[in-house]
Amino acid sequence: MELEEDLKGRADKNFSKMGKKSKKEKKEKKPAVSVLTMFRYAGWLDRLYMLVGTLAAIIHGVALPLMMLIFGDMTDSFASVGNVSKNSTNMSEADKRAMFAKLEEEMTTYAYYYTGIGAGVLIVAYIQVSFWCLAAGRQIHKIRQKFFHAIMNQEIGWFDVHDVGELNTRLTDDVSKINEGIGDKIGMFFQAMATFFGGFIIGFTRGWKLTLVILAISPVLGLSAGIWAKILSSFTDKELHAYAKAGAVAEEVLAAIRTVIAFGGQKKELERYNNNLEEAKRLGIKKAITANISMGAAFLLIYASYALAFWYGTSLVISKEYSIGQVLTVFFSVLIGAFSVGQASPNIEAFANARGAAYEVFKIIDNKPSIDSFSKSGHKPDNIQGNLEFKNIHFSYPSRKEVQILKGLNLKVKSGQTVALVGNSGCGKSTTVQLMQRLYDPLDGMVSIDGQDIRTINVRYLREIIGVVSQEPVLFATTIAENIRYGREDVTMDEIEKAVKEANAYDFIMKLPHQFDTLVGERGAQLSGGQKQRIAIARALVRNPKILLLDEATSALDTESEAVVQAALDKAREGRTTIVIAHRLSTVRNADVIAGFDGGVIVEQGNHDELMREKGIYFKLVMTQTAGNEIELGNEACKSKDEIDNLDMSSKDSGSSLIRRRSTRKSICGPHDQDRKLSTKEALDEDVPPASFWRILKLNSTEWPYFVVGIFCAIINGGLQPAFSVIFSKVVGVFTNGGPPETQRQNSNLFSLLFLILGIISFITFFLQGFTFGKAGEILTKRLRYMVFKSMLRQDVSWFDDPKNTTGALTTRLANDAAQVKGATGSRLAVIFQNIANLGTGIIISLIYGWQLTLLLLAIVPIIAIAGVVEMKMLSGQALKDKKELEGSGKIATEAIENFRTVVSLTREQKFETMYAQSLQIPYRNAMKKAHVFGITFSFTQAMMYFSYAACFRFGAYLVTQQLMTFENVLLVFSAIVFGAMAVGQVSSFAPDYAKATVSASHIIRIIEKTPEIDSYSTQGLKPNMLEGNVQFSGVVFNYPTRPSIPVLQGLSLEVKKGQTLALVGSSGCGKSTVVQLLERFYDPMAGSVFLDGKEIKQLNVQWLRAQLGIVSQEPILFDCSIAENIAYGDNSRVVSYEEIVRAAKEANIHQFIDSLPDKYNTRVGDKGTQLSGGQKQRIAIARALVRQPHILLLDEATSALDTESEKVVQEALDKAREGRTCIVIAHRLSTIQNADLIVVIQNGKVKEHGTHQQLLAQKGIYFSMVSVQAGAKRS
């Protein structure tokens, strides 16, 4: 099950390269660990458990063949009575009575034997199951911890080449596969093997001739079973592969749903999903055909072997070589032995799967990183001055060894100095910072602190003296205080408050309802960019680091936050050695040294003035920025600073910034939901009334011809079993009732022939039954998955905001619901019909032949059935509970793995390990409990079988002596009822599946029938031929549906004429991005209206409306496909030509970069575009928006993530793109919007000021103060 590989080899057919790779990997044999290595984590107690469990399993396995010995002797007793009474017609009543009394006495003894075996089984079956489960639970607990420790111990370079999603899968799926393979399944395997050997030994000792004849057909049976298993597992593999690819598409699409909706990509994504489903369906149908041909063939062979065995056996009895009891003992012993091999095969398969999974898991556990963050070795200097030096550093990333990043870097930083690194995107600035933390080691050269090579310093110690603030700060899904505590384990609340004040975050935190105990949400999604950044700064400050690394720490902030955060950083730098990376050069003017990077080396160094005189790289970058940046404050600039400070800055971070359902920037492309597979169980099991059986069948109604044929065959199959019982008892009756040898010979020939006919019928009916239901089931699964996905893509954005509908929850639902519905319709339905027919026919026949014994058996059967149901119930209940509890640990693991860089920089690996270990405690205790529960229920169901034999044959003997029944009829009733009951037991084991199916069906029906308020698929609404591009908001009131109590827009009115550029400014969280989302019609306003060319947008066709808009957001989401496909995604209504893609790339100034890549436009961008830098992603996103040729352009902070040079060219590209288009721009960097036709200042959800740059400066209001703050920062 190369699920991981599939997730990596993401979803699209056209990526033939990927396809080839996975095919090649498929062919190679999967590596597995040796049998003994599987148990490398077993302690002495586990070994004892396994040893005793194995002995118990062997004893349990021998019980069944032993019972057959008794059964044979018992048949002989009956036969002798039958023969005597037949042959001696003149027997006196007294003799008869004496004979029957002797028979009853013998039967009582046999009943005691049966009971004794049952009592033994009760004990050993419990030991067998519970001991193996205990041993497995204990080992898995260790493996989980070791594995998580190993992941936390790897170096960053290792993570670059391993897929994060894959590690999560390994941690959940692979470890549970090991669990499956090393627990009670091994006990069951030994039990089956003991039965096999026991059966054959008894067979050979009691009658070797007959054993050899039966064995002649066994290899054929075994071989066919083996081939069947092989074919089936290869189809299952391929089918899972196809489903995994479909799942990967769904996950990617749902994680980027806002991007998909904005660009109208629903149809394209549905097709992509459907192609993978089509493949899975095709394989599923093939699987159904092969599986059922083999199934039919197996039944044919089994019946043929019965025919042969009974024909030969009866010959031996007639020639007086064997007794009839001997024939039955040999026949059943060998048969049970042979079947036990078949029963062992799923256990062998589970063990083989476990070995394969263990190979991957142990490989990671054994992988020793070259940079070991847990290592105790290395120097820990008492006193660090903070003199840093990079000496002739050469470096390339492990994931792209061919691209050299640093080519001989030399740089010295003196203690207490601030050094700024400047240069273009991708020139190696961030790499330098990463080498300083020893996230990687250089290929050549040396990094040193105070003259000491950092490779000789203890890794953990080194990272603890460094504080890092990066461009996109990662917060963990816990409280604000906890997040800051990640900076330093033993920090006090006072220190946290002090750090927060220094980072200028205190005010906004105190305004939150729970203050420091406010949960920040997944990845900090509940806070705005500026708020997150300041918490990250506080987190770095509590470490009181000797060395501070600031990688673009203020780029994501709005003006006002930026000024205060910048002040906080300036304060933080005092007395510390600091390395700063900044695209915004105004923030690094006061650095002691500015180092200009170009092509992986430093080409110039000096302070601002020196470098300006040199007129090199730095000078160029500064000129580029200031050309657009000199904010004309005119004479106003000389206003005293105090006056600016006194201006109304009430817009600080008004509490409203908390609205961010997920920070406004993320809103266009919600972050990749990190709970991935770990969907909250509540989300999946919310209370929906289960759908009725008929409702489920209705979903499958178009396949009714298949069902008619299938049900007809199923009923015939059901009748075959009782027919077998009748023939079997007649064969035995031929001998127990006595009679001349010729008649016996004729009768036994006839009955043997009937066995063969049964086989031929079953071959045809089994194949047809399985195939028809299987095909109908596959068609249904595909149809449901497609309908559900289609319906999900139809929903509006507010539906995706609902915490119940995270990406993880939805992908899980897509994968599980359809499969579970199939569980209640497909082949399961066939088996239910078949088994009901089986028991029904069985009971009718039994009542005719012996109603007294039938009633006794019908009283016992429910007890066995109830025991079976209880066992199923307990196990499925436990499984649910397990899953729910492991979800908690899964969430911790996912968070740690996805944000591993942050965990490493903060040296918090051990903290996550402790949290993970704690979260495993409850599942571990449950596993221990479950071992006993499972052991008790299992042993009870097993032992009941022996007890019921005792009761049945003892009572049967009584009925025979009373001459109410013959032995032949006792056998008939017994086998008809017991086989029927076993069949019903099989049905009852489907009950949990059926229950799941009804819940899943109701989920599906609910989603399919849900029509959203804003329906992307609707054909209704106007589609004007002409669009000018006049936009008007009139008295718009809006709150996000997930936070109805927090007002966002409170009566907002604004207007932008065609071709104009409107700029929205305001502090974080004031509702700027919301304006863009309302225009895209992601949401509808609660009051007021939005107009386009004078028409209310609610009257326009949704798809048409979005096709007129092109959007570029701050953190663009790219899909895991080629650059060309990502750009072409801009217009999904047609096939975008290669020329257009190139033209758009040139306009967005990214063509040159793409052209320099080995695969050019076919280069894959990686999951969420991870293979590209921020600036490169942004430009591809701009090209994507331009391909649309939109009438209205929406730019939400489109340049904030870029370095100076990219920004300048991208800004030019955007200016060019704006020509003749209506444009709405959101920007924190005010210099980029000076030339806007209209600037609107939003505060608390209303327009506070509007006008041109000059008009607003003259008003000396909020805008003026924001500009002054930014200009002040520049001047300083």
From Swiss-Prot:
The modification Phosphoserine is found at S656. It is found in: Cell membrane; Apical cell membrane; Cytoplasm. Residues 1-15, 672-681 have a biased composition (Basic and acidic residues). GO terms for biological process: cellular hyperosmotic salinity response; cellular response to alkaloid; cellular response to antibiotic; cellular response to borneol; cellular response to dexamethasone stimulus; cellular response to estradiol stimulus; cellular response to external biotic stimulus; cellular response to L-glutamate. It is a multi-pass membrane protein. It is an enzyme of class 7 (translocase). One of its GO terms (molecular function) is efflux transmembrane transporter activity. The keyword ATP-binding applies. Residues 1-43, 134-182, 233-290, 349-707, 774-828, 871-930, 992-1276 are cytoplasmic. InterPro entries: AAA+_ATPase (IPR003593), ABC1_TM_dom (IPR011527), ABC1_TM_sf (IPR036640), ABC_transporter-like_ATP-bd (IPR003439), ABC_transporter-like_CS (IPR017871), P-loop_NTPase (IPR027417), Type_1_exporter (IPR039421). Residues 1-26, 646-681 are annotated as: Disordered. Keywords: ATP-binding, Cell membrane, Cytoplasm, Glycoprotein, Membrane, Nucleotide-binding, Phosphoprotein, Repeat, Translocase, Transmembrane, Transmembrane helix, Transport. Glycans are attached at N83, N87, N90. Interacts with PSMB5. PANTHER family: ATP-BINDING CASSETTE SUBFAMILY B MEMBER 1, ATP-DEPENDENT PERMEASE MDL1, MITOCHONDRIAL. Translocates drugs and phospholipids across the membrane. Catalyzes the flop of phospholipids from the cytoplasmic to the exoplasmic leaflet of the apical membrane. Participates mainly to the flop of phosphatidylcholine, phosphatidylethanolamine, beta-D-glucosylceramides and sphingomyelins. Energy-dependent efflux pump responsible for decreased drug accumulation in multidrug-resistant cells. In mouse the MDR gene family includes three or more related but distinct cellular genes. This is ATP-dependent translocase ABCB1. The gene is Abcb1a.
